Regions:
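Non-catalytic accessory regions of SAM-dependent methyltransferases
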Residues: 1-44, 51
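Conserved AdoMet
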Residues: 32-108
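Helix-to-beta-strand junctions that scaffold the AdoMet/dcAdoMet cofactor pocket
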Residues: 163, 209, 235-237
Length: 283
């Protein structure tokens, strides 16, 4: 006998709760809404509607994956970022709300100058570069990643948001394979987790997100060191370098900055008051 939407969510929430998944009811409802291709308003207003046996079976598969710790974003293959929807797979980091600070900081730095060229280092899903291109219709970007699989996802997201003609994708370890040129802005959400901190991460992050996009050496600063050193060759004078950092890294990052090369403009905090984004200007 078919079960109703409400019954499916209740059973799903109980299963996820037993598996230690936070906000189990919300997650169960979101997974069912995705499966039914409906929004949460529909789910709430049609709680007594039945779901088919096929839908129930698929929903149970979703729940099984989520109960094992797989992020919902990988199960559904999508994540919202700055009002846009992006395809995500285990080949790319899941875009986070705190990374939207990079977008806001970049918009503030660029101001009214729309004809900008910028580089996104470690583009992953492409969410940063693509979002900035939608904000600046005359901008052009180069998006770099060390992962072929990640670049494939980013290319599909660029096509989805119709910016393919304004973005070039480069397979490169930082700037190693990037032809010499200068940009108005370099932006990055680099890996910054210390190797010995991996065990402390949530299982959704630790066991499912790509390690290459998370960790960067013993102190988590290996990639940021390269970024601060190498970016100066790719920036015009008075151009900007903008990147995300870990919650406890602002002092260490400040010590990496050569004052003869860079002016430290700001370290932006997130809504919890945690330093998240560093803004530098090339002298």
């Amino acid at each position: 006998m078919p079960i109703s939407i409400a019954e499916a969510i209740l059973q799903g929430a109980n299963k996820l709760r037993k598996a230690g998944v936070p906000e189990a009811r919300r997650e169960a409802g979101s997974l069912l809404a995705f499966l039914l291709d409906k929004d949460r308003t529909f789910i709430l207003s049609h709680a007594d509607d039945p779901i088919s046996e096929e839908q129930e079976t698929l929903f149970q598969e979703f729940l099984d994956s989520r109960a094992l710790g797989e992020p919902a974003q990988y199960i559904t293959g999508r994540q919202d970022f700055y009002g846009l929807e992006f395809e995500v797979t285990p080949a790319v980091l899941i875009p986070r709300p705190e990374t939207e600070l990079l977008i806001e900081a970049a918009i503030k730095l660029v101001g009214t100058e729309e004809k900008v060229s910028f580089c996104d280092v470690g583009t992953g899903s492409g969410c940063i570069a693509i979002t900035l291109l939608t904000q600046f219709p005359q901008a052009h970007a180069i998006a770099i990643d060390v992962s072929t699989e990640a670049l494939g996802i980013a290319k599909r997201n660029a096509a989805r948001h119709r910016v393919t003609d304004r973005i070039e994708f480069v397979l490169s370890d930082c700037f190693a394979s990037v032809p010499q040129q200068t940009f108005d802005l370099i932006v990055s959400n680099p890996p910054y987790v210390a190797e010995d901190a991996v065990a402390t991460l949530q299982r959704e992050v630790r066991d499912f997100e790509p390690r290459v996009a998370l960790t960067a050496g013993a102190d988590g600063l290996d990639v940021i060191r390269r970024l601060v050193t190498d970016a100066q060759r790719y920036l015009q004078h008075n151009a900007h370098l903008l990147f995300e950092i870990g919650f406890d890294q602002h002092e260490a990052v400040g010590n990496l900055v050569d004052a003869q090369v860079w002016e430290l403009l700001d370290i932006h905090q997130d809504l919890q008051g945690i330093p998240r984004t560093v803004a530098l200007r090339r002298r």
